[in-house]
């Protein structure tokens, strides 16, 4: 087998050839803050995915922080219907308070879990399902005491969580206590993923997408928060920019004349990033389709290899395959071998629970312990050509 001279990267930034000019137009316009381009980008995203209650932010992490904040204990002046009709609540919803627990997976980027502690909440780790690397739903159900107020679930690699099973688990909880924990879906890997035929963001939960540099679509940096309810959406728009209502409503100066009823954050996207995001989003279908095509090729041709285990696939779970993960028995030698083949591979994310700042939340996670040393992701993105993906398969088949 002839080695490829150029290294096949695990990640690569996609930038539309028109993005530079569009960003330049904004830079030359004299207005580069949150404005018309942000509004246009949100409409573009909302129309495509079928949920117009989408809010752009400056990062996916900010979107998760905002979602948790929006679920905090209602203030007396809030509309009493703010949580009505939303899948995770009933009229008994108590709201999140400082010190409450959030169930979360440690197998993810730290950007998923740090917003939990930043909101003065406690993390309760849920073990992983080694067949998908998503949260183990049996363990989730075991770890839902009354003080659990939210679940932060990650769609690993873009492969959707079983949202129906999570709904059933939460329904049992609601039967006991009259309300159920909120579900926040971390879709940083899952831009364009579908569950049971519907894009993520349409299952009546908060959902975050990341627009960070190496994701399917980038705005240089940024995030999206899909909201499940009109009033939560309106609050999200306010709180991403200090709580200031940007709608003039007859005022001559909205900054100085508007009363701030609820303090907020500096989480907004600017028009430069939005302009870049819009240009890149025009290529979304082609890019995500290529990720899926390469993944399907691997699914077919990486079967029955000694020491290599493929992850589970189920009908109705349509991954956007930001990464393609598999389990390798002797990972150290696999890493070295793939490096010699000029193929970049990685675990991608370290388990969050072993960081020293997480010491107070330590617990036993047997599935993760057995699996973490085997997790490897191989190049699957839009940049991987037919020739390269064949080469990757050939190399893996000749390992050992």
Q: For the regions a protein language model found, what residue spans apply to each?
A:
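Conserved PLP-binding active-site segment in aminotransferase class I/II-type PLP enzymes
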Residues: 1-88, 95-97, 166, 296, ...
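PLP-dependent aminotransferase class I/II
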Residues: 38-44, 48-54, 138, 150-154, ...
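Structural detector of well-ordered beta-strand residues that form the stable sheet scaffold
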Residues: 55, 103, 124, 182-184, ...
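Conserved SAM-binding loop
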Residues: 56, 104, 125, 225, ...
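Buried hydrophobic packing segments
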Residues: 63-71, 116, 223, 277
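PLP-dependent aminotransferase-like
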Residues: 74-187, 194
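Conserved active-site segment immediately N-terminal to the catalytic lysine
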Residues: 179-219, 248, 256-261
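Short beta-strand-to-turn element immediately C-terminal to the catalytic PLP-Schiff-base lysine
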Residues: 209-210, 223-228, 278
């Amino acid at each position: 087998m002839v080695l490829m001279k150029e290294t096949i990267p695990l990640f690569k930034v996609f930038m539309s050839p028109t993005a530079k000019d569009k960003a330049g137009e904004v830079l030359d316009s004299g207005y580069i803050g949150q404005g018309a381009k942000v509004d246009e980008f949100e409409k573009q995203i909302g129309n495509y995915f079928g949920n117009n209650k989408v809010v752009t932010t400056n990062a996916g992490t900010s979107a998760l922080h905002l979602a948790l904040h929006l679920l905090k204990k209602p203030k007396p002046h809030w509309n009493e219907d703010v949580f009505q009709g939303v899948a995770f609540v009933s009229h008994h919803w108590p709201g999140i308070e400082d010190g409450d627990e959030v169930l979360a997976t440690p197998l993810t980027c730290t950007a998923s879990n740090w917003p939990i502690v930043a909101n003065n909440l406690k993390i309760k780790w849920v073990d992983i399902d080694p067949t998908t690397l998503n949260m183990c739903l049996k363990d989730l159900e075991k770890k839902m005491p009354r003080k659990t107020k939210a679940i932060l679930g990650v769609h690993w690699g873009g492969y959707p969580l079983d949202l129906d099973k999570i709904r059933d688990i939460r329904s049992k909880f609601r039967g006991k206590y009259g309300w159920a924990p909120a579900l926040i879906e971390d879709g940083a890997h899952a831009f364009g993923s579908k569950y049971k035929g519907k894009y993520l963001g349409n299952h009546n939960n908060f959902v975050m997408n990341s627009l960070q540099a190496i994701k399917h679509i980038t705005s240089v940096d940024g995030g999206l928060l899909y909201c499940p309810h009109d009033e939560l959406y309106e609050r999200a728009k306010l709180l991403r920019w200090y709580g200031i209502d940007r709608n003039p409503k007859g005022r001559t100066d909205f900054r100085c004349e508007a009363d701030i009823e609820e303090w907020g954050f500096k989480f907004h996207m600017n028009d430069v990033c939005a302009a870049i995001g819009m240009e890149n989003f025009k290529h979304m279908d082609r890019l995500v389709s290529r990720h899926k095509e390469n993944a399907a090729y691997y699914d077919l041709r990486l079967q029955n290899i000694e020491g290599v285990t493929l992850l589970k696939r189920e009908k109705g779970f349509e991954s956007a395959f930001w990464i393609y993960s598999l389990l390798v028995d002797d990972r150290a030698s696999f890493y070295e071998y793939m490096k010699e083949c000029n193929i970049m591979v990685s675990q991608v994310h370290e388990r969050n629970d072993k960081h020293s700042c997480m010491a107070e939340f330590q617990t036993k996670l047997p599935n993760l312990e057995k699996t973490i040393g085997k997790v490897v992701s191989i190049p699957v993105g839009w940049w991987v050509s037919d020739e390269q993906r064949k080469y990757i398969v050939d190399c893996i088949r000749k390992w050992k």
